[in-house]
């Protein structure tokens, strides 16, 4: 595999911002996510919205010069542990680059940063029918519980640190 690099996005860097919009739009185009992509107003408001949130962490994955993966995370607190927690809000890898360990590497970096901040856990949500993502999360040590939502069953998963 080409050299994989995981790094924190700089929300003032135009290349990073374009990659964030591109990867999240590609993710939204997936049939499991509705298949329609992000609306123009969402695409234009995405970066300003991320910049306004002090609790956001955006990690990008690059292979050589191409940015091919993203993890959008939100810092929070576990009230039951009285410690920080980190939620993976979005995790996506460009379709042509899947199956190459990029998602695993992004999750490992999320976990490393969570441990560094003393987090009690990393959490995420995944659609029950998204078997590829569920398999990845299970391999990475996440365990889940299901709940019904209008769009189907969503699993809330956590990895305790």
Language-model features, listed with the residues they occupy:
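C-terminal "cap" of GNAT-fold acetyltransferases
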Residues: 3-10, 23, 118-161
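Structural detector for helix-capping/boundary residues
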Residues: 89-91, 140
